[in-house]
Amino acid sequence: EYKENFRTLSNAALSGGVTSVVSMPNTSPVIDNVSMVDFIVRRGRDKAGINIYPSATLTRNMDGKLMTEFGLLSKKGIIGFTDATKTIQNAEMMSRIMDYASDIDVLVMQHPEDHELSKDRCISEGEISTRLGLRGIPYIAEKIIIERDLSLLEEYPCRYHISQLSSSKSVEV
């Protein structure tokens, strides 16, 4: 709660006319187990003046290696699974995630960004990055992951949401 707590979140949301939010799991500690989900649900109910819909991580500790327990967590009120701004880089892991998500009908949310193409960069490639003298993240870093995931969805159809797009070219995919 050092960056934000349920009261500050509620106040900000309500001042903008928002009555419901999805909480992201990239907290400290991350939301990747039943006890953390229970805590978030209970705290949201008791402290927030808005509806809090929690999400949990796709992988334990958001490290991209071991899937969290989708079945158990979804029964506790999780509305979707995401590793927040950490993209699942490994196609085999993503295929297993999608396969399991399809079986139990849970939402997978993915931030599309190829790590190798975005490493050590902090801004989209373009006029502003050039003017500031910064190495930009090329749009292809986003497109590669989107194309990969859309291909995987053909084999493992699940509910899937692409989060935080930064390029209009990605929408065209």
Protein language model annotation of sequence segments:
Residues S20-S23, G49-Y53, S124-L134:
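Gly-rich Lys/Arg/Thr-decorated short loops/hinges at beta-loop-alpha junctions or inter-strand turns
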Residues N33-F39, M62, K143-I145:
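Short amphipathic alpha-helical surface micro-motifs
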